[in-house]
Amino acid sequence: MQKQEKIIEMFNQIAPTYDKANRILSFGADVVWRKKACQRVMSLYLKKDLKIADIACGTGDMIEIWQESALKMEKNILNIKGIDPSSGMLNVAKEKFPNVEFIEAGAQNLPLESQSLDILSISYGIRNVVERQKALSEFARVLQKGGILVVLEFTKREKGGFIAACRDFYLKNILPSIGGIISKNKSAYEYLPNSIEGFLSKEEFILELKNAGFEMLDYKSFSFGVSSMFIAKKL
């Protein structure tokens, strides 16, 4: 089994308990980070009528937050799609949001027309894409000129110190144990800290975005560098 297929199968296995585990393990902070990202994009992008796709959508958390943010910012979502390669995750998403179109596909091969989107989001999923640069090129292809890409991701810590040490201890020791209890799959939650450590630094990822045809608009670090928000415009 190829690396990407193994990752997809892992998410299939933890899909039934994914939402519960996320809320507990992040102490609800992931919802706050998502809301801040969506609201920031809505404030930067001036069009009122929007076509949005959420890639690696999982169980659909971002779909709901996009809808809430549009209502709050007096925007109109003409169409919103959720795309994910995990059938298990999509089964949960479809139950939660029966009126939303969900598509089983990978980020590196999107079944979307070129220049068809205003906004594309991917939250805590880009580090799980093996062909990441191909995926970024796909994001640029499906976005209209001036369209917005927003990426939320766990990134490597850039500073040492007590807070960084606490973060590492939590990720490597506490999170896998609690995640394993909730999901009955400890190895899936051991994968998380390893995937973060194997991901890019902030500067490296920004360079990849630029090479894919994007211009950075905003960057923000949340919760002492635990999570990072990248907002970029397609040139």
Swiss-Prot record:
Keyword Transmembrane helix tagged: no
Keyword Acyltransferase included in the entry's annotation: no
Catalytic activity: a 2-demethylmenaquinol + S-adenosyl-L-methionine = a menaquinol + S-adenosyl-L-homocysteine + H(+); a 2-methoxy-6-(all-trans-polyprenyl)benzene-1,4-diol + S-adenosyl-L-methionine = a 5-methoxy-2-methyl-3-(all-trans-polyprenyl)benzene-1,4-diol + S-adenosyl-L-homocysteine + H(+)
SUPFAM superfamilies, per the entry: S-adenosyl-L-methionine-dependent methyltransferases
Pathway of action: Quinol/quinone metabolism; menaquinone biosynthesis; menaquinol from 1,4-dihydroxy-2-naphthoate: step 2/2; Cofactor biosynthesis; ubiquinone biosynthesis
Key words, A-Z: Menaquinone biosynthesis, Methyltransferase, S-adenosyl-L-methionine, Transferase, Ubiquinone biosynthesis
InterPro entries linked to this entry: SAM-dependent_MTases_sf, UbiE/COQ5_MeTrFase, UbiE/COQ5_MeTrFase_CS
The protein's name in its UniProt record: Ubiquinone/menaquinone biosynthesis C-methyltransferase UbiE
EC number: 2.1.1.163, 2.1.1.201
Listed Pfam families: Ubie_methyltran
Coiled-coil residues: none
Family: Belongs to the class I-like SAM-binding methyltransferase superfamily. MenG/UbiE family.
Top-rank lineage group of the source organism: Bacteria
UniProt GO BP: menaquinone biosynthetic process; methylation
Gene Ontology MF annotations: 2-methoxy-6-polyprenyl-1,4-benzoquinol methyltransferase activity; demethylmenaquinone methyltransferase activity
CDD domains: AdoMet_MTases (cd02440)
Gene3D superfamilies: Vaccinia Virus protein VP39 (3.40.50.150)
